[in-house]
Amino acid sequence: MARKPASSQDFETTLVQLENIVTHLENGDLPLEEALKEFEQGVQLAKLGQERLQQAEQRIQILLQKTEDAPLNDYKGNDYEGNA
């Protein structure tokens, strides 16, 4: 039976659940009512996944904006020569 997706679950879990629903629906062996419930849950999971992707994109944009103000310096690494 279809369950309501938890809004706190991560993107990967959401994607796996959505893929499972798609597989069940593609098999075509579900009774109509169960197929409708699976479809409804799939729509909810797709929306949740889209929200997660949008949140990630916003976070990336914020991080990129912050780094525009602070240019990156070349990494020189640890200089162990001469420190022995």
Curated annotation (Swiss-Prot):
It is an enzyme of class 3 (hydrolase). The keyword Manganese does not apply. Its EC number is 3.1.11.6. It is found in: Cytoplasm. Disruption phenotype: Essential, neither gene for this protein can be deleted. GO terms for biological process: DNA catabolic process. Transmembrane segments: none annotated. It catalyses: Exonucleolytic cleavage in either 5'- to 3'- or 3'- to 5'-direction to yield nucleoside 5'-phosphates. Belongs to the XseB family. Heterooligomer composed of large and small subunits. This is Exodeoxyribonuclease 7 small subunit. The gene is xseB.
